[in-house]
Amino acid sequence: MAKNAMLCLLILRVVLALAFATNKKGDEEPENHSTGIFGKVGRVVTVALAMSSRLGGADATRGGGAVYGRDLKSNQLPNNNWMAPPPPMAIRSAKVYDSKHSPAEYLKKFAQDFRRKTGMHSQRHHEETTLEQEKRVAGAGPDPIHHQDTTLEQEKRAVPAGPDPKHHEETTLEQEKRAVPAGPDPKHHEETTLEQEKRAVPAGPDPKHHEETTLEQEKRAVPAGPDPKHHEETTFEQEKRGAPAGPDPIHH
């Protein structure tokens, strides 16, 4: 501030000195009096401003950046790092392409990471389970026909004798032999075999499928023997036994 005040006083002194000098010349030269006092003052002010601008520029260059006696450092903010750039941020970018991995592998890995982060899955993932998941659930492996029929290996594990070749519609000959020692019925159990009937009935099966009893069985049941006419009429000997007077001659 003191330097600025001294500079202003110096300029005023120069201006006043020039003004008085021009006034004296005006008195000596009356022919130039037509310009007037205002023209002289204007010229003096112009010269003073030019001198002050030159002096200010010289002081600035001499003072190392000082303008009107003031240092530029006083205009700076208290923070000395106000023009410093912000610290570098950590940029999370994709990995640099490596020659060991192909672009297809990078795309596949990126898709897997994206699905894991967003929780999205492909449509096929929800429609069908993978082969590896089915193998984990079933030790024997998944069914190739999508669990519609059990596989041959699984049926062998469940049934030691093996699966039925006709999908369990009929039992196999080997399984029937195990269940029935005498063997299965060749007509699918519609009729019992002759050997099985002999075992059940010591006298043997009825050759007419039990529709009529045999002569030997009737003899065993009735000591007198069976009726030769299939029991439709009693015999003469039976009637004699039933009625002491003998049978009726009209009936027989």
Curated annotation (Swiss-Prot):
Q: Does the keyword Signal apply?
A: yes
Cite the InterPro entries for this sequence.
Answer: CLV3/ESR (IPR044962)
An example Gene Ontology biological process:
cell differentiation
Where does the record place its A- repeats? 127-135, 148-156, 169-177, 190-198, 211-219, 232-240
Renumbered to this chain, region (6 X approximate repeat A) spans 127-219
Chief site of localization: secreted
Q: Which family does it belong to?
A: Belongs to the CLV3/ESR signal peptide family.
Q: Provide the function of this protein.
A: Mimics host plant CLE extracellular signal peptides that regulate cell fate. May play a role in the differentiation or division of feeding cells (syncytia) induced in plant roots during infection.
What's the name of the protein? Answer: CLAVATA3/ESR (CLE)-related protein 4A-1
Q: Which organism is it from?
A: Globodera rostochiensis (Golden nematode worm)
